[in-house]
Amino acid sequence: MEDTQSVLQEYGLTAQFIEPVSPLVWKVYTDYGIFALKKLKEGRGKHFTDHMVAIEEKGFRSFVPVYRTNSGEFFSAGIQYGDIYYLMPWLQFDQEEERDQKHAYLFRETARLHERTAQELKVRRDEIERYYGQTKKKWEQDKIFYEQFVDRAEKEWYLSPFELQAITYFSETISAVNFALERLEDWYESAKEKDVSRVVMNHGSLSIHHFLYNDAGTGYFTNFERASVGPPQNDLLGFYTKMFRGFPKACPECVEWFYGYTKSFPLREAEVSLFLSYMAYPAAMYKVLNGYQTGKRQHEKEECTQLLKAYWQMKNIEPFVMKIHQIEQEKKFQAENESTS
């Protein structure tokens, strides 16, 4: 509490009441209104405010601003050494809307952010070939690793619960890797003929919990701490990877959100292929398998739970990427027919 009060003094504010919202966020009531005070997570850089200034200069203002201190700084140091805080207006995140409406709005605004910040970069063909070769080699080695794991396990007199589980998931995991490799090949064939690539300002932590609402129901991005310049599909990868974690779930509207985004900011053929490739690759499965194989062991029950969750994530992703691939193939086929007619 003392630390929070000292930080607020740098903004000329005195707290009447302070309500903890999370370990890093406080809702602060003052004579000048309600504010959100956030402590910067350890290890996070302060450069994200530069990104916020940059996107504002490009005409995008749908984000929660960070207030400057009385000395003109974006950040304030706390009493504890190394603690860094920043202050924002308080906005709600519990807007009463259906999930589909919330997400559709989020994806439209993400597309608008990407459209405002998009720029072309020159790319040499040897860079594309090197990236393709390195990624393909790694994923093919992962397939071999899993095959060898299964071969060794099947020779044992006794299979541990984890090994039995891993053998059960083997075929489906390899199929997912093969699909990812096929889409990587599609990306390479499309990208190698071009000498430009597109980058945008990615939010870096896309989530409905980082999309807040004012009293009029207008949405604003917050938490730009992981913002960075990169391919537009990076934000989508981060969002959907988190979305599909956990228990088995059906999400037909997830495809609709994707195409709501592309309606406002159309993705190029190479970008869609690379997005599908990385979405399909079962990274979580290999993370658990590698941990088991390299001796970074936990309790067998916990390892089995982690493997099951990774499997569920892979299976949740499967219908999503297959549906988008189907739609993209149909669009491509239709375009080819129209060009020859």
Curated annotation (Swiss-Prot):
One of its GO terms (cellular component) is endospore-forming forespore. It comes from the Bacteria. SUPFAM superfamilies: Protein kinase-like (PK-like). InterPro entries: CotS-like, Kinase-like_dom_sf, Spore_coat_YsxE. Gene3D superfamilies: 3.90.1200.10, Phosphorylase Kinase, domain 1 (3.30.200.20). Signal peptide: none annotated. NCBIfam families: spore_ysxE. This is Uncharacterized protein YsxE. It comes from Bacillus subtilis (strain 168). The gene is ysxE.
